[in-house]
Amino acid sequence: AVCCPAPGVIKSFEQDAWLAIAARNLALAQKTGADILTICNGCFGSLFDAAHILHNDPEKLRSVNKILREVGLEYNGETKVHHFAEMVYKEIGLDTVKSHIKAPLEMNVAVHYGCHFLKPSNIKQLDDPERPKILDELVEVTGAKSIEYKDKQMCCGAGGGVRSGNPALATKFTEEKLKNLKAAGAQYIIDVCPFCHLQFDRTQKE
């Protein structure tokens, strides 16, 4: 497998190349008889969106398979893509997670969902895109308190190529978000996206 590829970079200026690269990953998973489980919002968003397109657009599927046949692959449009947090919440369940908690956490946690975990909501439909609860409930089952804060659903600031194209603007977004969650009493941030995590970590240091 290769990069998902990154939705905010390749997809934004060359969708056909993005779709072909994503389809290669989907085809490799299909070849093993497995679905895909991601731990990254960007990978989840890219692969999920590509799988949705190829499942619903026969012409794009034919076009992609013409490319894939050059590397000995073919995709049937049926590989499922899941996010790790989604699987813990829906397949393992809160009760099972709670039964394994030995030392409940007593802390205030700010949850950051990130853009690609929930959107586009018309095809993902994992949770309410404006008032989601999956991560909040996973946090609270550990004994921690998931706090509400201003502009909770705002982007981390780095997405869509903003970090590389306009780092000052990206930093401004992140600073605003960090100020909001700190004002609400957050001690920790929980995220499910390595790119968001890097942006929060890097901006605090800067």
Where are the regions that the model predicts?
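Iron-sulfur cluster-binding electron-transfer modules in prokaryotic oxidoreductases
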Residues: A1-E206
